From Swiss-Prot:
UniProt catalytic activity: D-erythro-1-(imidazol-4-yl)glycerol 3-phosphate = 3-(imidazol-4-yl)-2-oxopropyl phosphate + H2O
Alphabetical GO biological process terms: L-histidine biosynthetic process
Protein's recorded name: Imidazoleglycerol-phosphate dehydratase
Alphabetically ordered keywords of this record: Amino-acid biosynthesis, Cytoplasm, Histidine biosynthesis, Lyase
InterPro entries hit by this protein: IGPD_sf (IPR038494), ImidazoleglycerolP_deHydtase (IPR000807), ImidazoleglycerP_deHydtase_CS (IPR020565), Ribosomal_Su5_D2-typ_SF (IPR020568)
EC number: 4.2.1.19
Listed pathway(s): Amino-acid biosynthesis; L-histidine biosynthesis; L-histidine from 5-phospho-alpha-D-ribose 1-diphosphate: step 6/9
GO cellular component: cytoplasm
Main EC class the enzyme belongs to: lyase
Pfam family, one: IGPD
Gene name, Swiss-Prot/TrEMBL: hisB
Localisation: Cytoplasm
Length: 204
């Protein structure tokens, strides 16, 4: 299996993003987005997926964090798709339940080439929840869905994320990111029993 690495740059009038990703890393992560809680989530994602992940993002956070967070998720998804290459020899499917104190979250991944995202189970109040920003740029939990959708669509994977139960918005969000991380780790890992593309169609 060749090196599974990617470097993607994306610049718009709203943000400038650079993501470097190594799927066969050891969890070395360096993230700077200008949104401290999002940095924390990306650190958790890279660490628990055992990816080497470098993210540098500058955006119009003086307006709010939305553009920077969503655009970073887009570029991460693009890097993930590029690093996967021809997808030969991978497990393809990944699944993880992650507890965090009172919260339990679940994520399932299919590296299918058919982008789709289902995000469900967050308490209704999450659409109004703000995490961090005292001081600094706050993270609005309503963007969680946008993050996971952007990753799925740009990596061309099917991603299902659900909250089974939980109360604290920080714990809920972090459990979701960690569940996605562990599911991705399992899905992209080499399978010693598979040499070709893991599909009856012969392509993903």
């Amino acid at each position: 299996m060749s090196d599974r690495i990617a470097r993607i740059e994306r610049t718009t009038r709203e943000s400038s993003i650079v993501v470097e990703l190594n799927l066969d890393g050891t969890g070395i992560v360096d993230v700077s987005t200008g949104v401290p809680f999002f940095d924390h989530m990306l650190n958790a994602l890279g660490t628990h997926a055992s990816f080497d992940l470098d993210v540098k993002a500058k955006g119009d956070v003086e307006i709010d964090a939305h553009h920077t967070v969503e655009d970073t998720a887009i570029v991460f998804g693009q890097a993930l798709g590029q690093a996967l290459g021809d997808k030969k020899g991978i497990r393809r499917f990944g699944d993880a339940f992650i507890p965090m104190d009172e919260t339990l979250a679940h994520a399932s991944v299919d590296v299918s080439g058919r982008p789709y995202c289902v995000h469900t189970g967050e308490p209704d109040y999450m659409v109004h929840s703000v995490i961090g920003g005292y001081p600094g740029v706050p993270y609005h939990a309503v963007i969680n869905r946008h993050v996971f959708e952007s990753i799925a669509l740009n990596a061309r994977i099917a991603l299902h994320v659900r909250v089974l139960y939980g109360r604290d918005q920080h714990h809920i969000t972090e459990a979701e990111y960690k569940a996605v991380a562990r599911a991705l780790r399992e899905a992209v890992e080499p399978d010693p029993r598979v040499s070709g593309v893991p599909s009856t169609k012969g392509t993903l």
